[in-house]
């Protein structure tokens, strides 16, 4: 099964300042392991204006082929507007 989830990265010397990539990966892989595609970026400390970036087109593609987002990834994708157009098209 393919998942959309967060992969932690950033400085090893400062564990209190994590950053995350929003990635598409096989569900059996490690959290920070090899991934199929990077579709976004998330900074939980919101230190920059672009603290959340998502390639909406690619996210919609992966969702259309059956990728399952984790709860946190789903919340971030919703915040980025990935689900907005789909809801309007279906109505």
UniProtKB/Swiss-Prot annotation:
The answer, when asked if Metal-binding is one of the entry's keywords, is no
UniProt key word RNA-binding: yes
Organism equals: Thermus thermophilus
Q: Subunit composition?
A: Part of the 30S ribosomal subunit.
Question: Where in this chain does the entry annotate a coiled-coil region?
Answer: none
Which GO molecular-function terms appear in the entry?
rRNA binding; structural constituent of ribosome
Q: Which cysteines are joined by disulfide bonds?
A: none
What SUPFAM superfamilies does the annotation carry? Ribosomal protein S16
One GO BP on record is: translation
User: Top-down, what is the taxonomic lineage of the species of origin?
Assistant: Bacteria, Thermotogati, Deinococcota, Deinococci, Thermales
**What family, per the record?**
Belongs to the bacterial ribosomal protein bS16 family.
The record's function comment reads: Binds to the lower part of the body of the 30S subunit, where it stabilizes two of its domains.
Superkingdom of the source species: Bacteria
Q: Which UniProt keywords apply?
A: Ribonucleoprotein, Ribosomal protein, RNA-binding, rRNA-binding
GO annotations of cellular component type: cytoplasm; small ribosomal subunit
Signal sequence interval, chain numbering: none
Q: State the protein's name.
A: Small ribosomal subunit protein bS16
